[in-house]
Amino acid sequence: IPYREFLLETVPYFVEQVEAYENGDDYDKSKVGLIQTPQSFYNADIFQFNLFSESTLPNEQDFFSKEINVCNNSHGAAVYTGSNTLIFRKAIEDVGGFPTDTITEDFELGVRMNAAGYVNYSTKSPMASGLTPTDLKSVIKQRARWGRGVIRSSYNMNIFFNPKLTK
């Protein structure tokens, strides 16, 4: 569920390139493809809940969402994690739309955008919240899906040898 400030915080990243595109100017594709805000949750994750430490331990997704993904900004390749995101529609169109042959279409779409010359940014401030799995079976199912999906997307994109993904 997005916070009231979501669009106020994310839309400004796109203003210049949208104006250029609408005016028929040749907009620079090395502009923003998406803005990823951190994952944030209303409920305690499985570790916080079982350790009775909701107020003392951060959510286990916080380190990636608020630290690692923000560091990815230094090379314009923040990971698209599927929610809490604003995406430049033209970027989606330029890469052929959302991938349909993977279960982690979010991750692959972000990589495709980078390969097409777009930059993806992540912010430190959460702008939306959702629910995190609360039992071990659900966590294992989610993480197995993430792992399988990233492996499939890596194969689809030839991610380790794709010259468009290295600088």
Where in the sequence are the language-model features?
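Short Asp/Glu-rich motifs
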Residues: 46, 111, 132-133
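Long helical/loop segments within the catalytic core of UDP-sugar-dependent glycosyltransferases
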Residues: 4-103, 136-166
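Catalytic donor-sugar/metal-binding loop of nucleotide-sugar-dependent glycosyltransferases
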Residues: 101, 110-128
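Active-site donor/metal-binding and catalytic loop motifs
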Residues: 124-138
